[in-house]
Amino acid sequence: MKANAAIPASSPAMQSPLDADDALFFLSRTGFSPAPADVARVVGMTRAQIVADTLGSVRREPVTTWPDWIAEPPPTRAQRQALTPDMRRDEQRERNRRYDELRAAWVNEMVVTPSPLTERMTLFWHGHFTSGQDKVPYPQTMAAQNALFRREALGNFGTLLHAVAKDPAMLQYLDGASNRKGRPNENFAREVMELFTLGEGHYTQVDVTEAARAMTGWTIDPDTLRFEVRPDTHDAGEKTILGETGPFDGDGFLDILLKRPGTARFIAAKLWREFVSDTPDPGALDTVADRFRASGYDIRAALAALWSTDAFWDPRNRGVLVKSPAEFVVGSVRLFDVAYGDPQMLANTVRTLGQNLFYPPNVKGWPGGALWINSTTLLSRKQFVEQLFRATETAGMRVPAHPMAPPPNARTHAMPVADMASAAGMRGTPARPARGGLRFDLERWLAQYRARPQAIAGLSTELQLQHAVLQLSPVAAIDTDSTGSAYLEALLMDPAYQLK
Protein backbone atom coordinates (compact mmCIF):
# COMPACT_ATOMS: atom_id res chain seq x y z
CA MET A 1 0.00 0.00 0.00
CA LYS A 2 1.40 3.41 -0.95
CA ALA A 3 1.96 5.73 1.99
CA ASN A 4 3.01 9.00 0.35
CA ALA A 5 -0.38 9.82 -1.19
CA ALA A 6 -1.88 10.47 2.23
CA ILE A 7 1.06 12.33 3.75
CA PRO A 8 0.84 16.15 3.76
CA ALA A 9 3.84 18.33 3.09
CA SER A 10 6.03 18.17 6.17
CA SER A 11 6.56 21.15 8.44
CA PRO A 12 10.04 21.75 9.88
CA ALA A 13 8.88 20.22 13.16
CA MET A 14 8.03 16.98 11.35
CA GLN A 15 11.70 16.67 10.35
CA SER A 16 12.73 16.34 14.00
CA PRO A 17 14.37 12.97 14.74
CA LEU A 18 12.78 10.70 17.33
CA ASP A 19 14.49 9.90 20.58
CA ALA A 20 13.48 6.83 22.61
CA ASP A 21 10.74 8.69 24.50
CA ASP A 22 9.28 10.03 21.24
CA ALA A 23 9.33 6.56 19.72
CA LEU A 24 7.65 4.98 22.74
CA PHE A 25 4.99 7.67 22.70
CA PHE A 26 4.21 7.33 18.99
CA LEU A 27 4.12 3.55 18.92
CA SER A 28 1.96 3.41 22.06
CA ARG A 29 -0.50 6.00 20.76
CA THR A 30 -0.89 4.48 17.33
CA GLY A 31 -0.78 0.82 18.33
CA PHE A 32 -0.17 -1.05 21.55
CA SER A 33 2.69 -0.74 24.04
CA PRO A 34 5.76 -1.64 21.98
CA ALA A 35 8.57 -4.03 22.81
CA PRO A 36 11.98 -2.40 23.39
CA ALA A 37 13.21 -3.70 20.02
CA ASP A 38 10.31 -1.97 18.26
CA VAL A 39 11.27 1.30 19.92
CA ALA A 40 14.94 0.87 19.01
CA ARG A 41 14.01 0.22 15.37
CA VAL A 42 12.43 3.65 14.88
CA VAL A 43 14.70 5.82 17.04
CA GLY A 44 16.41 8.29 14.70
CA MET A 45 13.57 8.36 12.19
CA THR A 46 12.01 11.77 11.70
CA ARG A 47 8.43 12.37 12.74
CA ALA A 48 7.42 12.47 9.08
CA GLN A 49 9.17 9.17 8.42
CA ILE A 50 7.51 7.31 11.29
CA VAL A 51 4.09 8.59 10.20
CA ALA A 52 4.71 7.44 6.63
CA ASP A 53 6.18 4.12 7.78
CA THR A 54 3.22 3.37 10.03
CA LEU A 55 0.56 4.32 7.49
CA GLY A 56 2.41 2.43 4.77
CA SER A 57 2.47 -0.87 6.65
CA VAL A 58 -1.24 -1.33 7.35
CA ARG A 59 -2.93 -4.61 6.49
CA ARG A 60 -6.31 -5.62 5.12
CA GLU A 61 -6.25 -9.26 6.23
CA PRO A 62 -5.32 -10.95 9.53
CA VAL A 63 -2.05 -12.80 9.93
CA THR A 64 -3.50 -15.45 12.25
CA THR A 65 -5.79 -18.38 11.51
CA TRP A 66 -9.38 -17.81 12.62
CA PRO A 67 -12.00 -20.50 13.40
CA ASP A 68 -13.19 -22.59 10.45
CA TRP A 69 -16.85 -22.12 11.38
CA ILE A 70 -16.66 -18.47 10.29
CA ALA A 71 -17.32 -19.70 6.74
CA GLU A 72 -20.33 -21.82 7.73
CA PRO A 73 -23.71 -20.53 6.53
CA PRO A 74 -26.20 -19.89 9.33
CA PRO A 75 -29.20 -22.22 9.60
CA THR A 76 -32.05 -21.36 7.27
CA ARG A 77 -35.36 -20.03 8.53
CA ALA A 78 -36.93 -23.48 8.14
CA GLN A 79 -34.09 -25.07 10.10
CA ARG A 80 -34.44 -22.51 12.89
CA GLN A 81 -38.18 -23.02 13.08
CA ALA A 82 -37.73 -26.81 13.33
CA LEU A 83 -35.63 -26.61 16.50
CA THR A 84 -37.13 -28.03 19.68
CA PRO A 85 -36.71 -26.09 22.97
CA ASP A 86 -33.84 -28.36 23.98
CA MET A 87 -32.20 -27.93 20.60
CA ARG A 88 -32.57 -24.16 20.89
CA ARG A 89 -30.81 -24.18 24.24
CA ASP A 90 -28.00 -26.30 22.83
CA GLU A 91 -27.68 -24.02 19.83
CA GLN A 92 -27.57 -20.96 22.09
CA ARG A 93 -24.77 -22.48 24.14
CA GLU A 94 -22.84 -23.25 20.96
CA ARG A 95 -23.32 -19.70 19.67
CA ASN A 96 -22.05 -18.31 22.97
CA ARG A 97 -19.04 -20.62 22.83
CA ARG A 98 -18.28 -19.49 19.32
CA TYR A 99 -18.55 -15.84 20.31
CA ASP A 100 -15.97 -16.50 23.02
CA GLU A 101 -13.76 -18.19 20.45
CA LEU A 102 -14.17 -15.20 18.14
CA ARG A 103 -13.09 -12.82 20.91
CA ALA A 104 -10.02 -14.96 21.56
CA ALA A 105 -9.13 -15.01 17.86
CA TRP A 106 -9.27 -11.23 17.65
CA VAL A 107 -7.16 -10.68 20.77
CA ASN A 108 -4.63 -13.15 19.38
CA GLU A 109 -4.50 -11.13 16.16
CA MET A 110 -3.92 -7.93 18.15
CA VAL A 111 -0.95 -9.52 19.90
CA VAL A 112 0.66 -11.08 16.84
CA THR A 113 0.00 -8.53 14.09
CA PRO A 114 2.99 -6.70 12.59
CA SER A 115 0.63 -3.72 12.07
CA PRO A 116 -0.79 -2.72 15.47
CA LEU A 117 -2.42 0.33 13.87
CA THR A 118 -4.59 -1.97 11.75
CA GLU A 119 -6.07 -3.61 14.83
CA ARG A 120 -6.35 -0.33 16.72
CA MET A 121 -8.42 1.09 13.87
CA THR A 122 -10.45 -2.11 13.57
CA LEU A 123 -11.22 -1.69 17.25
CA PHE A 124 -11.96 2.02 16.73
CA TRP A 125 -14.55 1.28 14.04
CA HIS A 126 -16.05 -1.50 16.17
CA GLY A 127 -16.73 1.12 18.84
CA HIS A 128 -17.93 3.70 16.31
CA PHE A 129 -20.21 1.57 14.11
CA THR A 130 -21.53 -0.39 17.05
CA SER A 131 -23.11 -3.82 16.72
CA GLY A 132 -23.21 -6.54 19.34
CA GLN A 133 -23.93 -10.09 20.35
CA ASP A 134 -27.15 -9.15 22.13
CA LYS A 135 -28.93 -8.51 18.80
CA VAL A 136 -26.72 -10.38 16.32
CA PRO A 137 -27.33 -14.04 17.10
CA TYR A 138 -24.84 -15.73 14.79
CA PRO A 139 -21.13 -15.02 15.37
CA GLN A 140 -20.40 -15.61 11.68
CA THR A 141 -22.22 -12.33 11.03
CA MET A 142 -20.11 -10.41 13.54
CA ALA A 143 -16.95 -12.04 12.20
CA ALA A 144 -17.83 -10.75 8.72
CA GLN A 145 -18.30 -7.24 10.12
CA ASN A 146 -14.94 -7.46 11.89
CA ALA A 147 -13.33 -8.44 8.59
CA LEU A 148 -15.01 -5.45 6.94
CA PHE A 149 -13.60 -3.08 9.56
CA ARG A 150 -10.13 -4.53 9.05
CA ARG A 151 -10.28 -4.28 5.24
CA GLU A 152 -11.43 -0.66 5.35
CA ALA A 153 -9.72 0.31 8.62
CA LEU A 154 -7.53 2.87 6.87
CA GLY A 155 -9.28 3.03 3.54
CA ASN A 156 -12.06 5.41 2.57
CA PHE A 157 -14.64 6.49 5.12
CA GLY A 158 -17.34 6.92 2.48
CA THR A 159 -16.78 3.38 1.24
CA LEU A 160 -16.88 2.12 4.82
CA LEU A 161 -20.07 4.04 5.63
CA HIS A 162 -21.90 2.62 2.61
CA ALA A 163 -20.68 -0.91 3.40
CA VAL A 164 -21.69 -0.69 7.06
CA ALA A 165 -25.18 0.45 6.11
CA LYS A 166 -25.56 -2.79 4.12
CA ASP A 167 -23.79 -4.98 6.67
CA PRO A 168 -26.08 -7.75 8.01
CA ALA A 169 -24.83 -7.30 11.59
CA MET A 170 -25.69 -3.60 11.49
CA LEU A 171 -29.05 -4.24 9.81
CA GLN A 172 -29.94 -6.59 12.67
CA TYR A 173 -28.50 -4.46 15.46
CA LEU A 174 -30.24 -1.20 14.47
CA ASP A 175 -33.39 -2.85 13.11
CA GLY A 176 -32.76 -1.79 9.53
CA ALA A 177 -33.89 -5.19 8.31
CA SER A 178 -37.46 -4.38 9.41
CA ASN A 179 -37.57 -0.96 7.70
CA ARG A 180 -40.19 -1.03 4.95
CA LYS A 181 -42.51 1.25 3.01
CA GLY A 182 -45.51 2.33 5.09
CA ARG A 183 -43.83 1.13 8.31
CA PRO A 184 -40.43 2.82 8.41
CA ASN A 185 -38.10 2.02 11.30
CA GLU A 186 -36.13 5.12 12.24
CA ASN A 187 -33.40 3.55 14.38
CA PHE A 188 -30.64 3.37 11.80
CA ALA A 189 -31.50 6.70 10.17
CA ARG A 190 -31.25 8.45 13.55
CA GLU A 191 -28.06 6.74 14.69
CA VAL A 192 -26.25 7.16 11.37
CA MET A 193 -26.66 10.93 11.75
CA GLU A 194 -26.20 11.22 15.52
CA LEU A 195 -23.44 8.68 16.13
CA PHE A 196 -21.82 7.89 12.79
CA THR A 197 -21.58 11.17 10.85
CA LEU A 198 -22.96 14.53 12.03
CA GLY A 199 -23.40 14.35 15.78
CA GLU A 200 -26.23 15.62 17.94
CA GLY A 201 -27.93 18.89 17.05
CA HIS A 202 -27.17 18.84 13.34
CA TYR A 203 -30.40 17.30 12.05
CA THR A 204 -34.12 17.40 12.82
CA GLN A 205 -36.77 14.79 13.47
CA VAL A 206 -38.10 15.49 9.97
CA ASP A 207 -34.68 14.56 8.60
CA VAL A 208 -34.82 11.29 10.55
CA THR A 209 -38.28 10.44 9.24
CA GLU A 210 -37.36 11.22 5.65
CA ALA A 211 -34.05 9.38 5.87
CA ALA A 212 -35.81 6.30 7.21
CA ARG A 213 -38.05 6.35 4.14
CA ALA A 214 -34.94 6.46 1.95
CA MET A 215 -33.54 3.38 3.70
CA THR A 216 -36.68 1.27 3.24
CA GLY A 217 -36.22 -1.95 1.30
CA TRP A 218 -32.71 -2.62 2.62
CA THR A 219 -32.98 -5.88 4.51
CA ILE A 220 -31.44 -9.34 4.91
CA ASP A 221 -32.43 -12.64 3.37
CA PRO A 222 -34.11 -14.71 6.13
CA ASP A 223 -32.31 -17.87 5.02
CA THR A 224 -28.78 -16.68 4.25
CA LEU A 225 -28.79 -13.56 6.48
CA ARG A 226 -27.12 -11.70 3.62
CA PHE A 227 -27.95 -8.16 2.51
CA GLU A 228 -30.60 -7.75 -0.14
CA VAL A 229 -32.71 -4.97 -1.62
CA ARG A 230 -36.47 -5.49 -1.94
CA PRO A 231 -37.88 -2.94 -4.38
CA ASP A 232 -41.46 -3.77 -3.38
CA THR A 233 -40.81 -2.56 0.20
CA HIS A 234 -38.87 0.57 -0.80
CA ASP A 235 -40.52 3.99 -0.66
CA ALA A 236 -39.59 5.50 -4.03
CA GLY A 237 -41.28 8.85 -3.39
CA GLU A 238 -39.53 12.17 -2.99
CA LYS A 239 -37.89 12.96 0.33
CA THR A 240 -36.35 16.12 1.73
CA ILE A 241 -33.26 15.38 3.82
CA LEU A 242 -31.04 18.12 5.25
CA GLY A 243 -32.43 20.57 2.72
CA GLU A 244 -32.02 18.35 -0.35
CA THR A 245 -35.05 16.96 -2.18
CA GLY A 246 -35.24 13.92 -4.44
CA PRO A 247 -36.33 10.26 -4.68
CA PHE A 248 -33.39 9.20 -2.54
CA ASP A 249 -32.60 5.62 -1.65
CA GLY A 250 -30.21 4.56 1.09
CA ASP A 251 -27.08 5.31 -0.93
CA GLY A 252 -28.44 8.72 -1.87
CA PHE A 253 -29.07 9.53 1.80
CA LEU A 254 -25.53 8.51 2.77
CA ASP A 255 -24.09 10.62 -0.05
CA ILE A 256 -25.93 13.63 1.37
CA LEU A 257 -24.24 13.02 4.72
CA LEU A 258 -20.82 12.76 3.08
CA LYS A 259 -21.32 16.13 1.39
CA ARG A 260 -21.81 17.84 4.74
CA PRO A 261 -18.64 19.47 6.14
CA GLY A 262 -19.84 18.49 9.60
CA THR A 263 -19.27 14.80 8.83
CA ALA A 264 -15.54 15.27 8.27
CA ARG A 265 -15.28 17.38 11.41
CA PHE A 266 -17.23 14.86 13.52
CA ILE A 267 -14.97 11.97 12.48
CA ALA A 268 -11.83 14.08 12.84
CA ALA A 269 -12.87 15.03 16.38
CA LYS A 270 -13.42 11.40 17.28
CA LEU A 271 -10.00 10.48 15.89
CA TRP A 272 -8.52 13.35 17.89
CA ARG A 273 -9.96 11.96 21.12
CA GLU A 274 -8.63 8.53 20.20
CA PHE A 275 -5.07 9.61 19.41
CA VAL A 276 -4.35 13.05 20.90
CA SER A 277 -6.40 14.25 23.88
CA ASP A 278 -9.90 14.45 25.28
CA THR A 279 -10.28 18.09 24.20
CA PRO A 280 -9.58 18.91 20.54
CA ASP A 281 -7.94 22.20 19.61
CA PRO A 282 -10.55 23.94 17.39
CA GLY A 283 -8.09 25.44 14.90
CA ALA A 284 -6.00 22.31 14.47
CA LEU A 285 -9.15 20.19 14.27
CA ASP A 286 -10.47 22.34 11.42
CA THR A 287 -7.21 21.76 9.53
CA VAL A 288 -7.45 18.00 9.98
CA ALA A 289 -11.13 17.95 8.98
CA ASP A 290 -10.47 20.08 5.89
CA ARG A 291 -7.70 17.74 4.72
CA PHE A 292 -9.89 14.72 5.42
CA ARG A 293 -12.75 16.12 3.34
CA ALA A 294 -10.46 17.39 0.56
CA SER A 295 -8.95 13.90 0.25
CA GLY A 296 -12.38 12.41 -0.45
CA TYR A 297 -12.49 10.90 3.06
CA ASP A 298 -9.18 9.04 2.92
CA ILE A 299 -8.74 7.80 6.49
CA ARG A 300 -4.96 7.67 6.13
CA ALA A 301 -4.99 11.31 5.06
CA ALA A 302 -6.93 12.21 8.20
CA LEU A 303 -4.45 10.37 10.41
CA ALA A 304 -1.45 11.82 8.60
CA ALA A 305 -2.82 15.31 9.17
CA LEU A 306 -3.68 14.54 12.79
CA TRP A 307 -0.25 13.09 13.58
CA SER A 308 1.40 16.13 11.98
CA THR A 309 -0.23 18.62 14.34
CA ASP A 310 1.80 20.34 17.04
CA ALA A 311 -0.80 19.15 19.54
CA PHE A 312 -0.10 15.49 18.83
CA TRP A 313 3.62 15.88 19.59
CA ASP A 314 3.16 18.35 22.46
CA PRO A 315 4.74 16.80 25.60
CA ARG A 316 1.77 18.09 27.59
CA ASN A 317 -0.43 15.61 25.70
CA ARG A 318 1.64 12.58 26.66
CA GLY A 319 0.20 10.30 29.28
CA VAL A 320 -3.20 12.03 29.18
CA LEU A 321 -5.24 9.17 27.69
CA VAL A 322 -6.28 6.02 29.54
CA LYS A 323 -5.46 2.69 27.93
CA SER A 324 -8.56 0.70 27.04
CA PRO A 325 -8.74 -2.84 28.46
CA ALA A 326 -7.64 -4.26 25.11
CA GLU A 327 -4.74 -1.82 24.92
CA PHE A 328 -3.73 -2.60 28.51
CA VAL A 329 -3.75 -6.39 28.11
CA VAL A 330 -2.47 -6.65 24.55
CA GLY A 331 0.10 -3.93 25.13
CA SER A 332 1.46 -5.70 28.21
CA VAL A 333 1.77 -8.99 26.32
CA ARG A 334 3.55 -7.33 23.40
CA LEU A 335 5.78 -5.17 25.60
CA PHE A 336 7.07 -8.11 27.62
CA ASP A 337 6.99 -10.75 24.86
CA VAL A 338 4.67 -12.84 27.02
CA ALA A 339 3.95 -16.30 25.65
CA TYR A 340 0.56 -17.88 26.20
CA GLY A 341 -1.20 -21.13 25.53
CA ASP A 342 -4.84 -20.19 24.99
CA PRO A 343 -5.71 -16.61 23.93
CA GLN A 344 -9.13 -17.12 25.52
CA MET A 345 -7.65 -16.16 28.89
CA LEU A 346 -6.50 -12.85 27.42
CA ALA A 347 -9.95 -12.18 25.95
CA ASN A 348 -11.51 -13.05 29.31
CA THR A 349 -9.22 -10.55 31.02
CA VAL A 350 -10.16 -7.83 28.53
CA ARG A 351 -13.81 -8.55 29.35
CA THR A 352 -13.15 -8.50 33.11
CA LEU A 353 -11.53 -5.08 32.72
CA GLY A 354 -14.72 -3.75 31.12
CA GLN A 355 -14.45 -4.28 27.35
CA ASN A 356 -16.33 -7.35 26.18
CA LEU A 357 -15.46 -7.43 22.49
CA PHE A 358 -18.42 -7.94 20.15
CA TYR A 359 -20.74 -7.01 23.05
CA PRO A 360 -20.56 -3.24 23.64
CA PRO A 361 -22.87 -1.87 26.35
CA ASN A 362 -25.18 0.04 23.98
CA VAL A 363 -25.43 1.69 20.58
CA LYS A 364 -22.96 4.39 21.67
CA GLY A 365 -20.25 1.80 22.24
CA TRP A 366 -17.87 2.03 25.17
CA PRO A 367 -17.66 5.50 26.75
CA GLY A 368 -13.91 5.08 27.21
CA GLY A 369 -11.52 7.65 28.61
CA ALA A 370 -11.36 8.01 32.37
CA LEU A 371 -14.49 5.84 32.63
CA TRP A 372 -12.35 2.79 31.90
CA ILE A 373 -11.03 3.11 35.45
CA ASN A 374 -12.99 2.52 38.64
CA SER A 375 -12.18 0.74 41.87
CA THR A 376 -13.17 -2.64 40.42
CA THR A 377 -11.40 -2.40 37.07
CA LEU A 378 -8.28 -0.86 38.62
CA LEU A 379 -8.04 -3.81 40.98
CA SER A 380 -8.48 -6.19 38.03
CA ARG A 381 -5.70 -4.43 36.13
CA LYS A 382 -3.36 -4.83 39.10
CA GLN A 383 -4.33 -8.48 39.39
CA PHE A 384 -3.37 -8.98 35.74
CA VAL A 385 0.06 -7.48 36.47
CA GLU A 386 0.40 -9.82 39.45
CA GLN A 387 -0.56 -12.69 37.16
CA LEU A 388 2.23 -11.74 34.75
CA PHE A 389 4.79 -11.85 37.52
CA ARG A 390 3.43 -15.16 38.81
CA ALA A 391 4.01 -16.44 35.28
CA THR A 392 7.66 -15.47 35.46
CA GLU A 393 10.21 -18.15 34.83
CA THR A 394 13.86 -17.55 35.58
CA ALA A 395 16.66 -20.01 36.12
CA GLY A 396 15.57 -22.68 38.56
CA MET A 397 11.97 -21.39 38.72
CA ARG A 398 8.84 -23.03 37.31
CA VAL A 399 5.70 -21.36 36.04
CA PRO A 400 3.07 -21.54 38.79
CA ALA A 401 -0.58 -22.22 38.15
CA HIS A 402 -2.89 -19.25 38.09
CA PRO A 403 -6.65 -18.73 38.51
CA MET A 404 -7.40 -18.23 34.81
CA ALA A 405 -5.61 -21.33 33.55
CA PRO A 406 -7.94 -23.92 31.95
CA PRO A 407 -7.82 -27.53 33.17
CA PRO A 408 -4.86 -29.65 32.00
CA ASN A 409 -6.95 -31.45 29.39
CA ALA A 410 -8.23 -28.22 27.83
CA ARG A 411 -7.48 -27.53 24.19
CA THR A 412 -4.73 -24.94 23.88
CA HIS A 413 -3.90 -22.53 21.09
CA ALA A 414 -0.17 -22.03 20.85
CA MET A 415 0.58 -18.52 19.70
CA PRO A 416 3.22 -18.38 16.96
CA VAL A 417 5.72 -16.88 19.39
CA ALA A 418 8.62 -17.10 16.98
CA ASP A 419 6.67 -15.13 14.38
CA MET A 420 5.82 -12.46 16.92
CA ALA A 421 9.40 -12.21 18.08
CA SER A 422 10.59 -11.94 14.50
CA ALA A 423 8.07 -9.21 13.73
CA ALA A 424 9.13 -7.33 16.85
CA GLY A 425 12.80 -7.65 16.06
CA MET A 426 13.55 -9.67 19.20
CA ARG A 427 16.70 -11.77 19.23
CA GLY A 428 17.37 -14.98 21.05
CA THR A 429 15.18 -17.99 21.67
CA PRO A 430 11.54 -17.05 22.37
CA ALA A 431 9.97 -18.22 25.59
CA ARG A 432 7.93 -21.41 25.38
CA PRO A 433 4.34 -20.94 26.53
CA ALA A 434 3.16 -22.73 29.62
CA ARG A 435 0.33 -25.08 28.74
CA GLY A 436 -2.87 -23.06 28.73
CA GLY A 437 -1.18 -20.25 30.68
CA LEU A 438 1.16 -17.29 30.52
CA ARG A 439 4.91 -17.35 30.51
CA PHE A 440 6.93 -14.17 31.04
CA ASP A 441 10.67 -14.71 30.75
CA LEU A 442 11.60 -11.87 33.08
CA GLU A 443 15.28 -12.72 33.15
CA ARG A 444 15.59 -12.48 29.36
CA TRP A 445 13.58 -9.25 29.26
CA LEU A 446 15.60 -7.54 32.01
CA ALA A 447 18.85 -8.63 30.38
CA GLN A 448 18.23 -5.98 27.70
CA TYR A 449 18.99 -3.46 30.46
CA ARG A 450 21.82 -5.46 32.01
CA ALA A 451 19.60 -6.19 34.99
CA ARG A 452 18.65 -9.39 36.77
CA PRO A 453 15.40 -10.24 38.58
CA GLN A 454 16.95 -10.79 42.02
CA ALA A 455 19.75 -8.19 41.84
CA ILE A 456 19.45 -4.59 43.03
CA ALA A 457 18.58 -2.58 39.94
CA GLY A 458 20.56 0.61 40.58
CA LEU A 459 19.64 4.15 39.55
CA SER A 460 20.72 3.90 35.91
CA THR A 461 18.73 0.72 35.33
CA GLU A 462 15.71 2.12 37.17
CA LEU A 463 15.65 5.13 34.85
CA GLN A 464 15.94 2.89 31.79
CA LEU A 465 13.05 0.75 32.99
CA GLN A 466 10.91 3.83 33.64
CA HIS A 467 11.49 5.10 30.11
CA ALA A 468 10.79 1.65 28.66
CA VAL A 469 7.32 1.22 30.17
CA LEU A 470 5.93 4.63 31.24
CA GLN A 471 4.96 7.81 29.41
CA LEU A 472 5.27 9.82 32.63
CA SER A 473 7.36 9.65 35.78
CA PRO A 474 5.94 7.25 38.38
CA VAL A 475 3.31 8.78 40.63
CA ALA A 476 4.28 6.74 43.68
CA ALA A 477 7.71 6.60 45.27
CA ILE A 478 9.52 3.31 44.65
CA ASP A 479 12.17 1.88 46.93
CA THR A 480 15.53 2.55 45.30
CA ASP A 481 16.93 -0.64 46.81
CA SER A 482 14.44 -2.77 44.89
CA THR A 483 15.50 -5.76 42.84
CA GLY A 484 14.98 -5.66 39.10
CA SER A 485 11.85 -7.77 39.41
CA ALA A 486 10.37 -5.75 42.26
CA TYR A 487 11.13 -2.42 40.61
CA LEU A 488 9.56 -3.41 37.30
CA GLU A 489 6.45 -4.74 39.03
CA ALA A 490 6.16 -1.49 41.00
CA LEU A 491 6.28 0.48 37.75
CA LEU A 492 3.46 -1.62 36.32
CA MET A 493 1.42 -1.11 39.49
CA ASP A 494 1.88 2.66 39.27
CA PRO A 495 -1.06 4.77 37.99
CA ALA A 496 1.18 6.04 35.18
CA TYR A 497 1.14 2.57 33.58
CA GLN A 498 -2.59 2.98 32.94
CA LEU A 499 -1.87 5.92 30.64
CA LYS A 500 -0.58 6.33 27.10
Task: Please provide the spans of the model-predicted regions.
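N-terminal accessory alpha/beta regions
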Residues: 34-152
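Active-site substrate-binding loop specific to GH73 endo-beta-N-acetylglucosaminidase modules
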Residues: 2-9, 82-87, 95, 99-106, ...
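Short linear loop/turn motifs
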Residues: 40-46, 227-229, 350
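Short alpha-helix boundary/capping elements
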Residues: 31, 59, 129, 133, ...
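A general structural motif at alpha-helix termini
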Residues: 43-46, 54-55, 164, 306-310, ...
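Hydrophobic/aromatic residues in well-formed alpha-helices
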Residues: 23, 39, 47-51, 208, ...
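Flexible, low-complexity segments enriched for small/polar residues
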Residues: 3-36, 264, 268-295, 304-500
